[in-house]
């Protein structure tokens, strides 16, 4: 069992693997090197079994499960924007919950790692030895709508899996009324035209989640979009009322 924590990762195992009631004990701990900035906010696993972790300052780390080696890369834009954004959000809000990256990531079967920064969603490709940001390897970065300036609060979700299916990655964007937003995971179809109101041609669909009430002016979600087939569902985390 692996858990991500603020400054690293922790491995746990059963005292007696043959006993289903055996207690868990910590067996190893990995601390991030000083050059990897920020706090960890996400953890997942690539198809080869390596852990992948993300920090709020835009670092992505691939970590061997025995903690013997790691590979790190910065997301596009992190070197110029992440530290300032994190400092500004902490000053404005009094906490570090609205970092340049503030959600976890999802991984597909080909090594694609999908993660959102404050105004872009990225596909970074794990080759088995390194992270690639190269379009030739299938990597991309695409902007999404971000009227609040706080970015997406949803960990990306995959939609479409069959060899002949359209394949998307789905987020809730950063507008005041959150839009469920689909990106083409793979190559954008040649005849695809950029949608009205979409800041990127990679966006395959978007629509506001009004929750059945078109008069609502603020709807936010902090959960991953729930996907079933090509259907998607979200919740509203805006409180129905506030104390005086």
What are these regions (language model features)?
Residues 1-5, 48-55, 61, 111-116, ...:
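Short beta-strand elements that form the blades of beta-propeller/WD-repeat-like
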Residues 8, 16-19, 45-51, 58, ...:
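Elongated scaffolding segments in large macromolecular assemblies
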Residues 1, 33-48, 82-107, 150-158, ...:
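Repeated scaffold domains used in trafficking and secretory/extracellular systems
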Residues 2-13, 25-64, 72-73, 99-106, ...:
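Mobile, glycine-rich extracellular loop/lid and propeptide segments
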Residues 49, 57, 67, 79, ...:
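Intrinsic-disorder/low-complexity loop/linker signature
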Residues 22-35, 69-96, 138-146, 204-215:
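A short beta-strand motif characteristic of beta-propeller blades
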Residues 5-17, 57-66, 118-127, 176-185, ...:
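Structural motif
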Residues 105-216:
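Long, internal scaffold/assembly segments composed of regular secondary structure
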């Amino acid at each position: 069992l692996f858990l991500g924590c603020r400054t690293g990762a922790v491995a746990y195992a059963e005292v007696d693997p043959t006993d289903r009631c055996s207690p868990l004990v910590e067996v190893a701990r990995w601390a991030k090197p000083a050059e990897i900035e920020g706090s960890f906010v996400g953890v997942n696993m690539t198809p080869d079994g390596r852990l992948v972790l993300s920090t709020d300052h835009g670092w992505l780390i691939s970590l061997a499960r025995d903690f013997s080696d790691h590979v790190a890369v910065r997301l596009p834009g992190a070197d110029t924007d992440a530290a300032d954004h994190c400092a500004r959000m902490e000053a404005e809000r009094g906490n570090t919950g609205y970092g340049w990256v503030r959600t976890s990531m999802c991984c597909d079967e080909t090594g694609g790692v999908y993660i959102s920064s404050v105004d872009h969603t990225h596909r970074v490709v794990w080759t088995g030895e390194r992270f690639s940001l190269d379009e030739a390897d299938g990597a991309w970065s695409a902007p999404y709508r971000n009227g609040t300036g706080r970015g997406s609060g949803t960990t990306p979700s995959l939609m479409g899996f069959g060899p002949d299916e359209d394949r998307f990655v789905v987020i809730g964007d950063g507008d005041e009324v959150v839009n469920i937003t689909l990106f083409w995971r793979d190559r954008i179809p040649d005849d695809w035209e950029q949608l009205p109101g979409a800041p990127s041609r990679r966006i395959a669909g978007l629509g506001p989640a009004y929750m059945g009430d078109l008069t609502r002016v603020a709807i936010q979600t902090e959960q991953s979009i729930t996907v079933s087939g090509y259907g998607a569902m979200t919740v509203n985390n805006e409180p129905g009322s506030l104390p005086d």
